[in-house]
Amino acid sequence: MTSVDINNNNNNNNNSNSNIIETKLIGHKDTVLCISSHNKKEIIASGSDDCTVRIWDLNTNKSIQSIVEGFQGNPVNNVCFDQDFTLYCSYDNIIVSFDLRQPNVILKEFNTQYKFNTEEINQLSFDSKYQYLAACDDSGQTKIIDVTKNKLVESLNKKHTNIATGCVFRPNSKNELITSSMDFSIIHWDFLKAKVLHRDTFKEGSLPQNISKSQQQQQETTEPNRMLNPPFVTSVDCSNNSKYVAISMGDGTIVINEISSFKQYLKINSIHKSSIQQVHYPKYLENNYQRLISFGNYDKKIVIWDVSEDMNTKVSSSLLSNDEKNNERIKTWLEHSEKINCLTTSNLKNNAIFVADLSNDLKLLSIQ
């Protein structure tokens, strides 16, 4: 474990408008792909390209358990805690669970295995009661699993026409789920009936013809106002008051909808110089609907936005340009040293962001 004060380290590539302390959680032997925080215990889990999972103690920032078998030599793409002692992990199209009460430091045997998805799983998500586990995949489908009965209860299919990038349950609702897709849409479901309650489709942009991936990446970095990606939806997250869903898109835009009406609450034409990889409501805030975290795909910039009603009133009544309005909304920003895979927060650790990037080390960013 090493700590760095980003603002005072001349050899670090990070830039920030706040004092950020970076702590490295060292243990994985390859790129960290995913992270999950426990809602009741001061632990987090991380999955890696090294085909293992590690459990970390937030008090010491050290690994206390590792799962080294059960993934058939595959990278672990998703991890998700239940409310007690079980960790669910996915690799390829398979989900396996592990009982963390085992006294062993190294775990090798899983408890349950689910093979309901047909293609690679992109996100795992629990409902508020931790009865239903959602798993969305590359086929565009989302499987709903009742983990108390170990059975598939519903398949949400034939509505998304491309990769399903995200799935999140509406907090404290009985049967509501929101999914996102590369088909430029998000869907609000009654997941127990496989019924579409709302759908929002974002206008498809146009891509230049005959452009290579490297050219696209370079142009995203050097020409922030010329987005080459269409607005495919890359992620979704719900606020803890159950009122809002935040949406990140490939054209660098953030949209927040009111869930009940599915009408647009606000739109941010982002300062990110690339597509936005993820949006996340910080779990450490009691009223987290007032703040939103985002990061870009290639620009490596992490931004904490003020999306409160007071700020909306302020910027909507001003004569500022879009860029100036964005600057008004920004509470904290930093440029990370590596391309980021994902991030999360914990309701048990204030002002802290956990970042999985292309390095082997999990990063804890403490905002001072």
UniProtKB/Swiss-Prot annotation:
Per-repeat ranges for WD: 27-66, 71-108, 116-155, 159-199, 228-267, 271-315
Stored PROSITE patterns: WD_REPEATS_1, WD_REPEATS_2, WD_REPEATS_REGION
Sorted UniProt keywords: Repeat, WD repeat
Pfam families from the UniProt entry: WD40
Family annotation (SMART domains): WD40 (SM00320)
Region entry Disordered, spans: 207-231
Protein name: WD repeat-containing protein 53 homolog
Gene (name only): wdr53
